[in-house]
Amino acid sequence: MAYALLAAMVLNGCATSKEKAARKTEQAAKVKAVLAEKHYKIVVNSMADLSETDEKRSPQLLSTYRLEVRNDSLITFLPHYGYNHILGEAGVGTRGLILYEPISSYQEELTKKSKRHIEISVEKEDDTLIFMIEVSANGNSNISVRSLRRDRISYFGNIMLD
């Protein structure tokens, strides 16, 4: 009786492991597909201020911030802490990274760790912004933004699959 119970538990565990592996494979295929279509949205839930200050900030974000690629356009609604070098402003306010701009360049490659590395460049008024995005097979995403006018900043979130 004990052997039958143990065998049932082991077989159930194997089925669960197979189901998890199948779900991971399916999710990786979905991530790959949305990236290939160049039509995806990344919902951002935290950020890291990478400015040259001694004080590093990494707040959780309470609102729905996002980065979206729609074919040849980049749409962002992201907060920005740090310094605006052209305007001489510090802090966060109405000057977040709010964009709806055509993409100047879009490059994607697969890294050695099986992550997708995407580099998107957009030009806005007198600034050029470069978005470097790392997307893992499970949809976790890291976004690093470089700008001529603002301090560098990073965001962390997940790609939306539905």
Report each predicted region and the residues it spans.
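Extracytoplasmic beta-rich ectodomain segments of secreted or membrane-anchored proteins
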Residues: 45-70, 77
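Helix-rich interaction surfaces within compact, conserved domain-sized segments
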Residues: 99-162
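C-terminal motif of bacterial Sec signal peptides marking the signal peptidase cleavage site
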Residues: 11-13
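Bacterial signal peptide processing site
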Residues: 15-18
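A short, Trp-centered hydrophobic/proline-enriched beta-strand micro-motif
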Residues: 33-49
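Bacterial N-terminal signal peptides that target proteins for export
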Residues: 1-2
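Structural motif
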Residues: 39, 71-75, 140
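Mid-length scaffold segments of soluble, non-membrane domains
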Residues: 63-111
